[in-house]
Amino acid sequence: MRLTALTVSGFKNLKDVSLHPDTHYNVIVGENAQGKTNLLEAIWILSGCRSFRGTRERDYLCFADSGPMQIQAAFDDGRRVQTITCTMQPSAGKEKRFLLNGIPVTSTGSLFDLFHCVAFTPEDLALINEGPEVRRNFVDLCYSQLTPRAVGAVRRYQMILQQRNAVLKQALPAAAAQAYLDVWDRQLAKTGAYLTVQRSRYLQQLAAVCTELYGAISAQQEAVTLRYQANVFGRDPDFSDCTEEQLAAQYYEKLVRAREEDRALGFTTCGVHRDEMQILINGVSAREFGSQGQKKSLALTLRLAHAQIYARKWKQTPLILLDDVMGELD
């Protein structure tokens, strides 16, 4: 994946930027608060994803200008050059609109499938320091770039989970509650089993590549280990002898057994939304015992490992965006 041209206007503090990047490596230098990270963020937004900085969309518009925002990039995926445009009008509800080769895009999922980026920022320390949800989201985003249908499965799971939790919060008669829950449990089990398999397969690949990359970074002095703690199926589950139908049946049975507790608590206590990816250095928790430099090296390793896995899968390297990559590395 090569970025061949980029124009940005009216995005945060970037009033009028036009670039024709080198096809291999580009280094952006400048004083603090000049817009270096904003430039990377603008490129990332064209993938159809939310800002990697958590920026609210209404804050995309230029600080010192009341005009519209436009981000446009031409990219070469090895087959042809295409153009993605993102616009936002101050007077149109501050909603993003995308064009692909001049044609309106109705689903940002199509951009996610076309324009692949891997971004590393200092905020990626959250992959190590924060709770399990951050790591689950990271893994889901990564395998979704390898298996496009998984994007819909992740969204579907969240929708079904919300519906199940809504039933759990209602003061329904026992028979009615069981009937409603059975409908949602069967759907949740099917989708949850699929996502568990996707996470397991991806994490096996990620663990192998991370071991290699982190070994090189640490001059073979430290070893990194990734463990998948699947809430329904246990640590590092082996699904080689199971079909998804069999896994869905096991998942469903666990949901059924948890119904009474879930009704008492008002939420779903088991499922892939409670999975964890544990990261260890030399056998101990990186989150609890790692230095700041080790944690940043690990976060960078996770991002670069995914880029390598992506390249193997699709026979092309994604666009890699690195922000302040050298600070605080051991």
For every predicted segment, state its role.
Residues M1-E31, L172-L321, G327-E328:
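Conserved NTPase motor "head" modules and their coupling/switch loops across ABC/AAA+ ATPases, GTPases
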Residues Y25, I43, P122-D124, G283:
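ABC ATPase nucleotide-binding domain signature
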